Amino acid sequence: MHKRLHMNPIWKKELVVGSRSMKMSWAIMGINTFLIIVVLIMLSITNMSAATSGYQYENLIWLFPILGCIECGLVSLIVPIITSGSISGERERQTLDVMLTTPVTTLSIAVGKLGSAMSVVMMYMITSIPVMAIAFVLGGMSWWALLGLFGMLLYLGIYVGSVGVFCSSVVKKSVVSTILTIAIGVGIIIVTTVILYAVIATQSAMCDAKGVTYTGPGAVAFIMMLNPYSPIVDFMMRVMMGTGIDRLLEEMGTKSSIILAISRWWIPCSIVINMIISFVFLKLAARNISVTRNRK
């Protein structure tokens, strides 16, 4: 006999509840409408410039990165809104106590809440394929680029979603949880960027004072691997220019073959690191839920 596929019960419940609501349909329609408007604006700008300088078809190549960055931004906003109210929302509806009486583990609860948010992301990605296909017709992008972008969106959704579930397990109000989730994400981006640029500025000033050539930030550049958006930047650079962050470090004067070799694998290295961080956030969320269960 064939074994039945086991599905996370929390994930299954969220899918059933979500399928009965029109909110997801309206949200997906709104997102795709926004993407279509962006495409129409870019085509209008190209047509207007054609009157003076002729059609600049090479400008349409930027359709893909612009749409891709917009999608990443939307995922960064939508997923926190969904996940930041996952646990705190159950508290507000006073249904968390009932959920904790079931044999479902607290980690399964956290993973199920994240999985339901990722289902929304996957639905959003699938419905955006017709809009993104315009970048293939006009911008000359390949299907591999689209698959890579979808992989980046899934990775970003998991990272941001795990932070949202953690924040939702810490605070009691969904609004506060949403703000805290966005604040943590923005804080990570700002801190890693500021540290890198501070090191670069300091090293560059010291090299100028000594009259020697600046040889790049060195291993400090790897702190940007903690930035969840750095793999997306590397991916876009490789799609558009054929080179990634490794080339950028080389142009900054980096001579170390080890640093350059590691930076060529920037995307997988950064994704693995951030997925480990995501798992830690989920474990912490499960621990916080366990504390709530033990108090009952």
Question: Where does each model-flagged region fall?
Answer:
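Secretory targeting signals
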Residues: 65, 73, 116-172, 180
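Transmembrane alpha-helical segments and their membrane-interface loop/helix boundaries
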Residues: 1-73, 160-169, 175-296
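Short, charged cytosolic
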Residues: 1-7, 91-99, 121, 150
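Transmembrane helix boundary and interhelical loop/hinge segments in multi-pass membrane proteins
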Residues: 79-100, 113-114
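Membrane-interface alpha-helices at helix entry/exit sites of multi-pass transporters
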Residues: 105-117
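Long, hydrophobic alpha-helical segments
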Residues: 63-89
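Well-ordered mid-protein domain cores that form the structural environment of catalytic cofactors
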Residues: 73-74, 81, 97-100, 105-108
